[in-house]
Amino acid sequence: MKIIKFYILFFIPLLIACKHDEQLPSNQKVEFILLDSYETKLGSKAILESSIILNDSSLIEYSDIIAYDPETHRFFLTASANQALAKIGSEKLHGKAFALTINREPVYTGYFWAAFSSSICDWVNVDPLSFANTTFFEVKLGYPWYSPEMQIPDNRNDQILLDILQQDGKLK
């Protein structure tokens, strides 16, 4: 009986104290990368993830991201990153496909789709005009509005993405 009490008194507190740490590695990088090549679903702007080829360099690096608001899907950037994107210009970015990646693995894809466009985009999109006018950009579903018939998968709040941003103090 004394042995059982010993095990209970010794090992249970030891097991409780050995909490498993589920932190992500600190070298996780979230980036926006332009696509060099991709295919779309027939009759749609939906990008087939299996077909994408990422550009070698990132358009928006992790160090450029100040914060992300999961409720509004807004990314807040450094002033220098915002200025660099504004300098590229909405005309050059409009229609360009991108991927949000974690360590160069796509989480979701989308397009830079300017608000001056009269074309519909049935996929994830970012208005490049926002780079010249605000300190943030919003990742949206569908342009000019979202309709359930578009069947756009919503990975904007991917749990691994949120965990990385939370760990690094970049989640609003």
Show the residue positions of the predicted features.
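Sec-dependent signal peptide recognition
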Residues: 2-9
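C-terminal motif of bacterial Sec signal peptides marking the signal peptidase cleavage site
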Residues: 16-17
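Short, conserved catalytic or interaction motifs in soluble domains
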Residues: 20
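A structural signal for conserved, well-ordered secondary-structure elements
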Residues: 23-172
